[in-house]
Curated annotation (Swiss-Prot):
Belongs to the FKBP-type PPIase family. Tig subfamily. Consists of 3 domains; the N-terminus binds the ribosome, the middle domain has PPIase activity, while the C-terminus has intrinsic chaperone activity on its own. GO terms for biological process: 'de novo' cotranslational protein folding; cell division; chaperone-mediated protein folding; protein transport; protein unfolding. It comes from Staphylococcus carnosus (strain TM300). It comes from the Bacteria. InterPro entries: PPIase_dom_sf (IPR046357), PPIase_FKBP_dom (IPR001179), Trig_fac (IPR005215), Trigger_fac_C (IPR008880), Trigger_fac_C_sf (IPR037041), Trigger_fac_ribosome-bd_bac (IPR008881), Trigger_fac_ribosome-bd_sf (IPR036611), Trigger_fact/SurA_dom_sf (IPR027304). Keywords: Cell cycle, Cell division, Chaperone, Cytoplasm, Isomerase, Rotamase. This is Trigger factor. HAMAP family: Trigger_factor_Tig. PANTHER family: TRIGGER FACTOR CHAPERONE AND PEPTIDYL-PROLYL CIS/TRANS ISOMERASE (PTHR30560), TRIGGER FACTOR-LIKE PROTEIN TIG, CHLOROPLASTIC (PTHR30560:SF3). Involved in protein export. Acts as a chaperone by maintaining the newly synthesized protein in an open conformation. Functions as a peptidyl-prolyl cis-trans isomerase. GO terms for molecular function: peptidyl-prolyl cis-trans isomerase activity; protein folding chaperone; ribosome binding.
């Protein structure tokens, strides 16, 4: 087999491939064995028609397409390996010659991974991050942990407040008519969660158990159900029950419940301070790395094929669907609640997808320029870290992955990021940046 690559405009080119006649004839033989099983000719049992009779009746040309289907995958794969190109999408195949006793010739129009023109990536000025834990941050973490131990208590007196969970019945109307999906009974809604149409939850604040109210809202213009988009609606709402979070006080018993290694409040706070301090140091370094990556990527130039962006969007949609499922929802329910559809969500994600692709291309280009490689020792360390993190044996991880190539690529990228930060110049943040950080 021979293959040649001719670069065309943009990120496309033509891969011209020739497969020897011997392989073509072998593929035609395989095609006959497959096709003859489906052929009915009077006087012969199904699958027992002689080759000569078949070709007299249908012609050898009837086998060509199946022969091409047999030959193409292997020939295309070998051609990619021989020419060293990196396709990012399915090729467009044009068969130029397929005939018994002759070579198969085909052209594959291929979109390939683009070349990256690197800009400045060494000696980047990076803002140094504050890694010191404050008392306020420690207290916030304590309050957050106590919140997980909070019990939901029925509010006998008083009205709905932000953070309360209300049990409601509601019945929605548009132009005086009920609409599909606009009714529910005994529905639990946390006020401030943003789960309902904008303006709905806010109008329940101040109501008491047993109260009824007409809640008037307007569906978003981009609402997934076109018949409701932009329409004014009225929901007849009844408050069945109000619950609030009863947060416990921190004492020695609670401290031990939150941290089994702590016998009292002081030990709990000290252990928590150590853990949070380490986390903040790691987070600070990650922010610095992120800035280094962003600057290196922004300084690079690359023409990204639409196919690469679409492939990344597919991955992002899968990731999003998994996160939604973990929260107990599915995409269909999410779209109903959010007022979006899939095409709108993909469009919303498109810039991030393009940024992801550019980042990956840029970091790999830097790895090539700096001859950064992942050694077997690097890969083994990463697998051990994954084993510890996910509590899975290294062997099981290898079986699941099927290959360590993904791990190798990840390690290589991590080494590039470390290189960017090691070469960077850490500078103290400006006063404006410090004030902005304090405001957060």
């Amino acid at each position: 087999m021979t293959a040649t690559w001719e670069k065309k405009e943009g990120n496309q080119g033509v891969l011209s491939v020739t497969v020897p006649a011997k392989k073509v004839d072998q593929a035609i033989d395989q095609a006959f064995k497959k096709v003859v099983k489906q052929v009915n000719i009077p006087g012969f049992r199904k699958g027992k028609v002689p080759r000569q009779i078949f070709e007299q009746r249908f012609g050898v040309e009837a086998l060509y397409q199946d022969a091409v289907d047999i030959l193409l995958p292997e020939a295309y794969g070998e051609a990619i390996e021989e020419t060293g190109i990196k396709p990012v999408d399915q090729p467009e195949i044009e068969v130029n010659q397929i005939e018994k006793g002759k070579d198969l010739k085909f052209d594959a129009t291929v979109t390939v991974q683009p070349e990256v023109k690197l800009g400045e990536y060494k000696g980047l000025e990076i803002e140094k991050q504050n890694a010191d834990l404050t008392d306020e941050e420690l207290q916030e973490a304590i309050d957050h942990s106590l919140g997980h131990l909070a019990e939901m208590v029925i509010k006998e007196d008083g009205s709905v407040e932000e953070g309360d969970t209300v049990n409601i019945d509601f019945d929605g109307y548009v132009d005086g008519e009920q609409f599909e999906g606009g009714q529910a009974e005994s529905y639990d809604l946390e006020i401030g969660s943003g789960m309902f149409i904008p303006g709905f939850e806010e109008q329940l604040v101040g109501l008491k158990t047993g109260d009824e109210k007409d809640v008037k809202v307007t569906f978003p213009e981009e609402y997934h159900a076109e018949e409701l988009a932009g329409k004014e609606a009225t929901f007849k709402v009844k408050i069945n029950e109000i619950k609030y979070k009863n947060v416990p006080e921190l004492d020695d018993e609670i401290a031990n419940e939150l941290d089994s290694d702590a016998d009292n409040v002081e030990e709990y706070k000290e252990n928590l301070r150590k853990r949070l301090s380490e986390e903040k140091k790691v987070n600070a370094e990650n922010v610095e790395k992120e800035e280094a990556i962003n600057k290196a990527v922004n300084n690079a130039e690359v023409d990204i094929p639409e196919a690469m962006i679409n492939n990344e969007l597919d991955r992002m949609m899968q990731e999003f669907a998994q996160r939604i499922q973990q929260s107990g929802l599915n995409l269909e329910t999410y779209f109903q609640i959010s007022g979006q559809d899939e095409s709108q969500l993909r469009e919303q994600m498109k810039d991030d997808a393009e940024e992801r692709v550019k980042t990956n291309l840029t970091l790999n280009a830097i790895a090539n320029a700096e001859e950064v490689e992942a050694t077997e020792e690097d890969i083994d360390k990463e697998l051990e870290a994954m084993s510890t993190q996910f509590n899975i044996s290294v062997e099981d991880i290898k079986k699941t992955l099927g290959s360590t190539d993904i791990v190798k690529d990840d390690v290589r990228v991590k080494k590039v990021i470390d290189l960017l930060l090691d070469d960077a110049k850490l500078v103290e943040p400006s006063e404006d940046a410090e004030e902005e950080s304090e405001d957060k």
